[in-house]
Amino acid sequence: EFTIFSLLFSLLLLNASAEQCGSQAGGALCAPGLCCSKFGWCGNTNDYCGPGNCQSQCPGGPGPSGDLGGVISNSMFDQMLNHRNDNACQGKNNFYSYNAFISAAGSFPGFGTTGDITARKREIAAFLAQTSHETTGGWPSAPDGPYAWGYCFLREQGSPGDYCTPSSQWPCAPGRKYFGRGPIQISHNYNYGPCGRAIGVDLLNNPDLVATDSVISFKSAIWFWMTPQSPKPSCHDVITGRWQPSGADQAANRVPGFGVITNIINGGLECGHGSDSRVQDRIGFYRRYCGILGVSPGDNLDCGNQRSFGNGLLVDTV
């Protein structure tokens, strides 16, 4: 009897401690100082944080090299997004501030701090490039060029619907709309729900916090960036070289590089049919930001010859 009781207790304890974070728990984060293992558990040993064992909140380099402020300075940030406070932009009055970006990034320890300095710079350039495309206010003949107008908009343009899909897990709140907001233009109740749970904010009842609270706005975008969505890897794992394409990925021409990140975000509409102006816009931002950070953009920037992963978080919004 004692043996059976002990076994049952151990199983209950195991179930209670499993699936605390990461893709197994809707992108939920561990407490500060803990890593999320590839199995979705939180801890701070090599089994959780070591190479090949960690899926998110992984340790960066030691000392100053692991500090995001050492990768991108305030002046670089302003140079990249130098028209975000233009009078024509919703983000004027410095909504998308450097301090808000750094503060939000602090909740995701691996973001911009994983790998060597080249990997860290490329991640910041890629993140700001993809989100700049989603929020751009630029046009071909815009002052300083079309790639100087990222982070202009806070909310989806036009007349968006409520983006409410019936769900018992992520029920829509009365009168709330879940259209695109923030740097990554997160949309749909089934994305606001898990994002809010991961960052500790009730976004189902308060979706507009993504467009009114600067730190929450950046957190929503970094959450998307860091969260794998099977069969897709996370954008973070791609740009830092942690993702290794499977046989199916290779057969679909999905190889490591900036192009796969575009495929993750909006491959269903933009990838697999040759040249696409939206893809080229993303690449244009990326090349400019890599130049400012003093790093090469790497290979495989396009996704024109890649088959898409299928629908993603943003496929219906862009």
UniProtKB/Swiss-Prot annotation:
Active site (UniProt): 134
Record's subcellular location: Vacuole
GO molecular function: chitin binding; chitinase activity; endochitinase activity
Family: Belongs to the glycosyl hydrolase 19 family. Chitinase class I subfamily.
Task of the protein: Defense against chitin-containing fungal pathogens.
Catalysis: reaction(s): Random endo-hydrolysis of N-acetyl-beta-D-glucosaminide (1->4)-beta-linkages in chitin and chitodextrins
Signal sequence interval, chain numbering: 1-18
Organism of origin: Solanum tuberosum
Name this protein carries in UniProt: Endochitinase 3
Propeptide span(s): 312-318
Induction (UniProt): In response to infection, elicitor, ethylene, wounding.
Disulfide partners: 21-36, 30-42, 35-49, 54-58, 89-152, 164-172, 271-303
Keyword Cell division: no
Domain Chitin-binding type-1: 19-60
